[in-house]
């Protein structure tokens, strides 16, 4: 298996140098110093549970659909579903869900609309049993076993398996890697996995490898996931960092 330094060197060469790479990894240049600006480092603790349900729902609707359409319609989703207030969602009768699923202002997919109430119920039940917000539950879960949180969401939620749950967690600011096609291809090329991507054996091996890289580097799982993707596959787009009046000006170059 490759070390962090080897992966970093290759990604840096492909992306136009270390400073450019750090920006792509989720950091920005202020003056001559690199400052962290990564969503994975933001606290999930401050979030209310309606924001968690909103993120779950957004990723459910993005799955297998055009993301920009979901983003364009999202304000209508927020309005239609009471800004994802858990108690109000749980009070919605089936007939109301059916009517809202037929509203052209949102994406008309009844099976996905039903997940809103189902996932609200999951969150409510957990909060009731443990006397804590679901957002706090997510915040407290150790990223060194992030696959365990994935498994929880898959088991207890609806349509939160695969990459849907991980993308929602990242949207919320929870540190997690994403098993994109580039990351999967890399893991297979390094013989870290050889079976099904979502099998318990594969996920355990992947978590172990990411934990090892994190111990070597101090980078977040989010950054490491991006780093592996940048170091592999066909994404050779580079950025040039030009220092102007202590600000970082970024220009994009295509590279073959």
For the regions a language model picked out, list residue spans one by one.
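Generic alpha-helical structural context detector
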Residues: 58, 118-121, 125, 185, ...
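N-terminal polyanion-binding entry modules of DNA glycosylases/AP lyases
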Residues: 1-109, 113, 227-234, 241-246, ...
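C-terminal accessory module of base-excision DNA glycosylases/AP lyases that mediates lesion recognition
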Residues: 1-37, 131, 135, 139-256
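Alpha-helical ds-nucleic-acid-binding substructure associated with the helix-hairpin-helix region
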Residues: 82-159
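A generic secondary-structure signal for well-formed alpha-helical elements
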Residues: 64, 81, 127, 190-191
């Amino acid at each position: 298996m490759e070390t962090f330094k080897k992966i970093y060197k290759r990604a840096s060469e492909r992306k136009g140098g270390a400073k450019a790479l750090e920006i792509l990894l989720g950091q920005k240049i202020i003056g001559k110093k690199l400052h962290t600006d990564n969503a994975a480092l933001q606290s999930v603790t401050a979030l209310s549970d309606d924001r968690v349900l909103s993120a779950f729902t957004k990723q459910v609707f993005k799955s297998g659909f055009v993301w920009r359409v979901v983003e364009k319609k999202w304000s209508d989703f927020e309005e239609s579903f009471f800004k994802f207030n858990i108690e109000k969602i749980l009070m919605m009768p089936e007939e109301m869900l059916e009517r809202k699923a037929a509203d052209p202002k949102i994406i008309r997919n009844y099976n996905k609309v039903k997940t809103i109430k189902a996932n609200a119920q999951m969150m409510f039940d957990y909060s009731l049993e443990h006397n804590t917000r679901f957002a706090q539950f997510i915040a407290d879960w150790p990223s060194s076993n992030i696959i365990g949180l994935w498994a929880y969401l898959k088991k207890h939620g609806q349509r939160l398996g695969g990459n849907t749950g991980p993308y929602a967690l990242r949207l919320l600011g929870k540190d997690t890697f994403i098993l994109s096609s580039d990351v999967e291809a890399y893991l297979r090329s390094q013989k870290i996995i050889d079976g099904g991507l979502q099998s318990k054996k594969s996920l355990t091996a992947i978590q172990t490898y990411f934990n090892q890289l994190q111990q070597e580097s101090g980078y977040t799982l989010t950054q490491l996931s991006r780093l592996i993707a940048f170091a592999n596959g066909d994404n050779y787009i580079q950025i040039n960092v030009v220092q102007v009046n202590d600000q970082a000006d970024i220009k994009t170059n295509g590279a073959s």
